Amino acid sequence: MIGALHACVDAEPKIINDIWADFWKSQINSVLLNPSDGSETYLASDNGKSTSSREQSTSPDDDNLLMNEDDGIALEDDNDTGESAAKRRRTRTNFSGWQLEELESAFEASHYPDVFMREALAMRLDLLESRVQVWFQNRRAKWRKREQNRNGSSEIKKDDGEQMETKALPTFPFSIDSILAVSRVPRGRRPNAKYPRVQACKNLSPFMIPLFPITQPGGNVIREKSPPLPTQQSQIVATNALTTVAELLKSV
């Protein structure tokens, strides 16, 4: 009996070790055969340290499935890009003359029509409300650009006018002295040196101003009314004297 017990005790560790060995082999084989579950196997090394490794391998069938899925995604992307390009590509609306006249009159009434006004115009002109809205946006942009150009040109003209006003020549009262004071006469030369007639006319009395025009260096011609000639005055004085003498003789 004792020998049989010893034999059973000695056999138990071997059976347990065999069971554990079979269990671990099955686990390792299951992990190696099914790597998609993402499990990690820890293998004991000779020095007693554990290392982790992830096995990644795919079968040809899995590769084909992945390729087909990628192709499907690429086809869907192509369809999306085609639809977006079709949305971005809008047809240009050609307005008739009557439609443009109606739109222009509505724009003169209001630059920013509300939704109800746009819908009424669209129904009246047989257009889409979005087309009417786009036309008003473009018309407002054109109007703003025209106003900016107009304001810029008016400012330029105003600046030019101010510059011309500042550059205007000073005005002088009409007289011989003021004309001679203008810087047209060369410096360092007296007027009587080159223009003796002008100086002589300045020295004359008002009753002795000649009838000929006075010409200045710049070509300006001055004409003044001349008083009665001295001969006419002497004749008047002589006639008056004769009449007085005749009256005196009659009285005597």
From Swiss-Prot:
GO annotation, biological process: cell fate specification; locomotion; negative regulation of canonical Wnt signaling pathway; negative regulation of transcription by RNA polymerase II; neuroblast fate determination; regulation of axonogenesis; regulation of DNA-templated transcription; regulation of synapse organization
Annotated consequence of substituting residue 188 to D/S: In e26/e2307; unable to crawl backwards. Abolishes interaction with unc-37
DNA-binding region positions on the chain: 88-147
Alphabetically, the GO molecular function entries are: DNA-binding transcription factor activity; DNA-binding transcription factor activity, RNA polymerase II-specific; RNA polymerase II transcription regulatory region sequence-specific DNA binding
The listed outcome for residue 174 to E is: In wdEx65; unable to crawl backwards. Abolishes interaction with unc-37
Instruction: Provide one Gene Ontology cellular component.
Output: axon
Q: Which Pfam families match?
A: Homeodomain
What's the chief localization of this chain?
nucleus
Going by the UniProt record, its keywords in alphabetical order are: Developmental protein, Differentiation, DNA-binding, Homeobox, Neurogenesis, Nucleus, Repressor, Transcription, Transcription regulation
Q: Which named protein is this?
A: Homeobox protein unc-4
Q: Which organism is it from?
A: Caenorhabditis elegans
